[in-house]
Amino acid sequence: YFEWTTYKSKVKPFYDVDVFYESKEEQEKNIEIIKNETRDLLKQIYPETTIAIASSHGEKYKNKSVNKVKTQIKGYAISFHFVMCDYETTVGELKVFNELNGLYDVKFKDTNLKMFDKAVYRDGGNMRFLYSYKPNDDRQKVPDNYKDSYCLTKHVIQSSNATNHFRRALPDTVSPPTTPPVSPKPKD
């Protein structure tokens, strides 16, 4: 199942995070780190939200070009979907909000990896719903929180009376996003 959205669709702010690792150990080590860094940043931007988090981690193949020769690389994906409940906007307004506030340039600490996938903010696109799969992909999207049947509407992107209680406007001003600070390393 998918949700179809256009630039004019009323939605809750949503963010897609996709990180690829060639090593399963690196992927497993970073799942909670990536989830926590992303959630902490989004909570600063949307202070009055509850955040519905879903994931679809697992084995993934990625195309890589070297000297114009495409090869497929086996790796492991970390994939999260964050939905800001109790806020409402349109896909087009959210795309502009994210651009104006530099959210597409935020990187995970100690990495060169960008936090947010901006390709999901398009005029006409399918967003996968819970318990669904992308075509030709074995990774199922499952809720990390709000798993009870009466809470699953928190994961729905489209905003309506049935899916979104307060429907607050996007914040007027946002502090410039920063990569979360690095904790000092203990001295030997």
Question: What is each of the regions a protein language model found here?
Answer:
Residues 149-188:
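Long, charge-rich alpha-helical interaction segments
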Residues 96, 141-143, 170:
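General "foldedness" signal
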Residues 51-53, 118, 161:
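Residue-level detector of intrinsically disordered, flexible termini
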Residues 1-114, 127, 133, 178-188:
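Signature for HUH/AEP ssDNA processing cores
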Residues 113-151:
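C-terminal polymerase-core module
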